[in-house]
Protein backbone atom coordinates (compact mmCIF):
# COMPACT_ATOMS: atom_id res chain seq x y z
CA UNK A 1 0.00 0.00 0.00
CA UNK A 2 1.50 3.31 -1.02
CA UNK A 3 1.72 5.77 1.83
CA UNK A 4 2.96 9.12 0.61
CA UNK A 5 2.24 11.81 3.18
CA UNK A 6 3.75 15.21 3.18
CA UNK A 7 5.36 15.61 6.58
CA UNK A 8 6.00 19.06 7.86
CA UNK A 9 8.08 20.24 10.76
CA UNK A 10 7.32 23.41 12.64
CA UNK A 11 9.25 25.15 15.37
CA UNK A 12 7.35 26.52 18.32
CA UNK A 13 7.99 29.87 19.95
CA UNK A 14 9.72 31.38 16.93
CA UNK A 15 10.29 35.05 17.55
CA UNK A 16 12.38 37.77 15.99
CA UNK A 17 15.03 36.45 13.64
CA UNK A 18 14.20 32.87 14.57
CA UNK A 19 10.93 33.18 12.69
CA UNK A 20 13.14 33.19 9.60
CA UNK A 21 14.47 29.69 10.34
CA UNK A 22 15.50 27.72 7.28
CA UNK A 23 14.54 24.05 7.31
CA UNK A 24 15.80 21.45 4.88
CA UNK A 25 13.94 18.20 4.21
CA UNK A 26 14.56 15.49 1.64
CA UNK A 27 12.13 15.77 -1.28
CA UNK A 28 11.21 12.10 -1.04
CA UNK A 29 11.85 8.92 0.89
CA UNK A 30 11.17 5.34 -0.15
CA UNK A 31 10.91 2.29 2.08
CA UNK A 32 9.63 -1.26 1.75
CA UNK A 33 6.44 -2.47 3.45
CA UNK A 34 7.21 -3.61 6.99
CA UNK A 35 10.42 -1.57 7.11
CA UNK A 36 11.07 1.57 9.13
CA UNK A 37 11.57 5.10 7.88
CA UNK A 38 13.62 7.94 9.32
CA UNK A 39 12.67 11.42 8.15
CA UNK A 40 14.91 14.33 9.02
CA UNK A 41 14.47 18.06 8.98
CA UNK A 42 17.69 20.01 9.39
CA UNK A 43 17.81 23.52 10.82
CA UNK A 44 20.14 26.13 9.39
CA UNK A 45 23.42 26.96 11.06
CA UNK A 46 23.05 29.28 14.03
CA UNK A 47 19.78 27.76 15.25
CA UNK A 48 20.22 24.87 17.68
CA UNK A 49 17.67 22.07 17.42
CA UNK A 50 18.26 21.41 21.12
CA UNK A 51 16.54 24.68 22.02
CA UNK A 52 13.25 23.97 20.24
CA UNK A 53 10.20 21.78 20.47
CA UNK A 54 9.76 19.99 17.15
CA UNK A 55 6.26 19.45 15.74
CA UNK A 56 5.47 16.89 13.04
CA UNK A 57 2.34 16.89 10.88
CA UNK A 58 1.08 14.59 8.15
CA UNK A 59 -0.76 16.00 5.16
CA UNK A 60 -2.33 13.86 2.48
CA UNK A 61 -3.48 15.38 -0.82
CA UNK A 62 -6.83 17.12 -0.45
CA UNK A 63 -6.79 16.94 3.36
CA UNK A 64 -5.76 19.38 6.06
CA UNK A 65 -2.59 18.73 8.07
CA UNK A 66 -2.93 16.13 10.85
CA UNK A 67 -0.91 16.64 14.03
CA UNK A 68 1.27 13.61 14.72
CA UNK A 69 3.50 14.52 17.63
CA UNK A 70 5.85 17.01 19.18
CA UNK A 71 9.25 16.35 20.70
CA UNK A 72 11.50 18.38 22.97
CA UNK A 73 13.26 15.60 24.88
CA UNK A 74 12.69 11.98 25.88
CA UNK A 75 10.99 13.24 29.04
CA UNK A 76 9.05 16.04 27.32
CA UNK A 77 7.13 14.83 24.29
CA UNK A 78 3.50 14.43 23.21
CA UNK A 79 1.78 11.96 20.90
CA UNK A 80 -1.26 13.22 19.01
CA UNK A 81 -4.66 11.73 19.75
CA UNK A 82 -5.10 8.46 17.86
CA UNK A 83 -1.54 8.51 16.49
CA UNK A 84 0.00 5.03 16.80
CA UNK A 85 3.18 4.52 18.83
CA UNK A 86 4.99 3.46 15.65
CA UNK A 87 5.42 7.22 15.07
CA UNK A 88 8.10 8.68 17.33
CA UNK A 89 10.29 11.75 17.48
CA UNK A 90 13.87 12.51 18.32
CA UNK A 91 16.63 15.06 17.73
CA UNK A 92 20.18 14.68 16.49
CA UNK A 93 22.38 17.46 17.83
CA UNK A 94 25.33 16.34 15.69
CA UNK A 95 23.39 17.09 12.49
CA UNK A 96 21.14 19.78 14.05
CA UNK A 97 18.03 17.92 12.90
CA UNK A 98 14.61 16.91 14.11
CA UNK A 99 13.80 13.28 13.34
CA UNK A 100 10.56 11.41 12.79
CA UNK A 101 10.74 7.62 13.01
CA UNK A 102 7.97 5.51 11.50
CA UNK A 103 8.13 1.77 12.10
CA UNK A 104 6.09 -0.98 10.49
CA UNK A 105 5.38 0.73 7.18
Swiss-Prot record:
GO terms for cellular component: extracellular region; immunoglobulin complex; plasma membrane. Keywords: Adaptive immunity, Cell membrane, Immunity, Immunoglobulin, Immunoglobulin domain, Membrane, Secreted, Signal. Its main location: secreted. The keyword tRNA processing does not apply. Residues 78-105 are annotated as: Framework-3. Residues 1-19 form the signal peptide. Residues 20-105 form the Ig-like domain. Gene3D superfamilies: Immunoglobulins. InterPro entries: Ig-like_dom, Ig-like_dom_sf, Ig-like_fold, Ig_V-set, IgV_Light_Chain. Residues 71-77 are annotated as: Complementarity-determining-2. GO terms for biological process: adaptive immune response; immune response. Residues 20-44 are annotated as: Framework-1. It is found in: Secreted; Cell membrane. Residues 54-70 are annotated as: Framework-2. SUPFAM superfamilies: Immunoglobulin. Immunoglobulins are composed of two identical heavy chains and two identical light chains; disulfide-linked. Probable non-functional open reading frame (ORF) of V region of the variable domain of immunoglobulin light chains. Non-functional ORF generally cannot participate in the synthesis of a productive immunoglobulin chain due to altered V-(D)-J or switch recombination and/or splicing site (at mRNA level) and/or conserved amino acid change (protein level). Immunoglobulins, also known as antibodies, are membrane-bound or secreted glycoproteins produced by B lymphocytes. This is Probable non-functional immunoglobulin lambda variable 5-48. It comes from Homo sapiens.
Amino acid sequence: MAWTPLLLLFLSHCTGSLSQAVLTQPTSLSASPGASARLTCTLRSGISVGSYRIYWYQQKPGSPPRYLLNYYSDSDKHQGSGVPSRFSGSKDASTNAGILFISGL
